[in-house]
């Protein structure tokens, strides 16, 4: 799918071999698609971590654990887009989360980072029912 999606085939190198227990970015090709649990085995550092709209689908303890592994990789910048107020709560008739994760949670969990900017209007989105899809930018503390 990925190879077929890019016109410049020469620039697309996809990691298609099985990686060892622990691995670094040097073991990866330009594009690597790994299951989320493999973040625990990744060694090294990154410049930018991006999460768009998936943290809001998880329970807070899962996000906190994931972020602990992201912080271990010491990205210089973090870019998040999620619902500021959190995902709707699950009910007997509606899907949702058991406990919402909000902007305050992200700021607390990314303890090695400082707030740069938050915006719903620039590149974010406010739904008709008042939920705010927020773009949040953090940078590593000196």
Annotated model-derived regions:
Residues 40-41, 57-59, 86-89, 124:
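Flexible loop/turn segments at secondary-structure boundaries
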Residues 87-100:
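Short, flexible/disordered intra-domain loops and linkers
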Residues 51-54:
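A short beta-strand submotif of the Rossmann-like class I SAM-dependent methyltransferase core
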Residues 57-70:
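A short, conserved alpha-helix within the catalytic core of class I
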